[in-house]
Amino acid sequence: DDVTDGCALAEGAQRVDAPKGAVYRFNQSPKECVAWLTSGADCKALGATELARWFLTEEGLSTKQLGSWLGGNSELQVAALRAFAGELDFGEMAVVDALRYFLSLFKLPGEAQMIDRIMQAFADRWAAVRADETLTADVVYVLAFSLIMLNTDLHNPQIAPDRKMTREQFVRNNRGIGVGGTD
C-alpha cells in the first residue's frame, strides 16, 4: 500500500498537527481515527478543513485508506473532501494534468458512488479555479470520468489489445459534452 508523502498542500495553507499515533490509527481504521481527531479528546478537535490539511501534509497516511475515507458519504466526509479539493491550486493546469495530480494524492476507491463524489469535488474545484465558460464543472465531471475509463481500459490486462479503446472511439464517446452540446 502506498503512503502519502505529505507535500501536497496548496501554497500558503497551514500545516495541521495531530497527536502522536494518529497516522498509525488512521491507517488501521480511518473512521475511528477521524472520530478521535474530531472529538477533541486528546487534542483540539479538528473540523473538515483541518482534516483536509492534515491529509495533505501528513506523511505516511495510507493512500488506499485516504481514498476510501474521502469517498464516503457522511456529512463530515463530504465536507472534508470538498475542503481537500479546495486546498489544491490547479493554477493553469489542463484538466488531464489537474486530474492526474489530484489522483496522485490518494488511491481512487472502486465503488462507483465514491468515485462519483470524488470526481464531482474535483470538477467543482477545477471549474472554480479556472473560470472557463466552455469547461464548466459539469463538463469537467464528464470528461474526468471519461479519462478514468480510458485509463482503466488502457491498463487493464484483461482487455485484449485489439479491444482497447481507440482515439477515435474516445473522441466519439465525448462528442457533445461541452456547454450546449458542443465539442
Tell where the protein language model's regions lie, with residue ranges.
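A short glycine/serine-rich beta->alpha loop
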Residues: 130-136
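Catalytic and GAP-homology cores of small GTPase regulators
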Residues: 1-125, 132, 141, 152-183
